[in-house]
Amino acid sequence: MQYLGEVISLVVACSWTVTALFAEIGSKRLGSLQMNVIRMLLSLLMLGATLWWFTGSPFPLYADGKAWFWLSLSGFVGYLLGDYCLFNSYIWIGSRFGQLFMTLAPPTAALAGWIMLGETLSWNALLGMMVTLTGIGISVLNKGTTNKLSLKLPLKGVLFGIGAGVGQGIGLVLSKVGMTCYEVSIPASEEVVSDLMPFASTFIRAVTGAVGFLCVMGFQKQFHTLVTSARDRKGMNAALWATITGPFIGVSLSLTAVQYTEAGIASTLMALTPIFIIWPAHLLFNQKVTFKEVIGACISVIGVSLFFI
């Protein structure tokens, strides 16, 4: 089928849009920490079942100490820090603006790759960073009565949004290091294990995320809140669907998309979530959407696309 990869990439963007909407609902009903714990545990069950079905083991095969270290570190930064900030941003500024700040992930990943891995930082990447930041600025800044620029969103929500994008970007680079180590440790004859390496890597990251969130919950003495959360049917349904459409369907389809089209095209189309989420967020949460915010979201996505040209 012609343009199959492009179609799948658009489906991924839609899937992540649905994930963000359900995550906002779940976070507001259950709490960001509770939502993250439940989502991580559900992710482990789904990923473990997938690995078991195809490889005969629910746990990552052939992953050595180096792979576990780097992928666990990636899970700590990307899930424990990044997702904690992301889900809190949903509570403070909503999933629409939360996803807008996630466009900071590609520039952060580019900078982290340059610093940590010695990767080349092209002029397109630098331009993409400036365009992305401009788009975010257009969306979240207003001129006050004194004609001075000011935030139109709660500062705490903006900081959580920035933390989410930065955490996601750094976590991505650490994940790349971990997957490189993992790939070397898999025997050439184990093609199935090699094909499922992204799922196994996500499993390792999710283990760190789940353990980390449970430790935070224990430190804050909030284990009892999981019982209360389990009784909230709407909140639990939101957590379930956020897990299915995000870590499970979103990840699997994103891996499939790059098999049928160029990675740059797939990445750009999958980055359309900040635009796709505008109308559903307006309908579901009665959020007022201005023309300037739509333009800002479009500019941010254009900035992201420059990283892949």
Model-based region annotation:
Residues 11, 38-39, 101-104, 123-127, ...:
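Hydrophobic core positions of alpha-helical segments in small-molecule transporters
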Residues 74, 119-132, 196-209:
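Alpha-helical transmembrane segments
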Residues 41-46, 101-115, 130, 208, ...:
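Alpha-helical transmembrane segments of compact multi-pass small-molecule transporters, enriched
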Residues 1-15, 20-34, 38-73, 83-93, ...:
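Membrane-interface interhelical linkers
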Residues 17, 48, 76-80, 107-111, ...:
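Hydrophobic/small/kink-forming positions within alpha-helical transmembrane segments
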Residues 86-105, 114-121:
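Membrane-interface helix-loop-helix junctions at boundaries between adjacent transmembrane segments
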Residues 170, 175-177, 250-270:
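Alpha-helical transmembrane segments and their membrane-interface junctions
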Residues 1-14, 107-166, 170, 176-177, ...:
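Juxtamembrane helix-loop boundary signature in multi-pass membrane transporters
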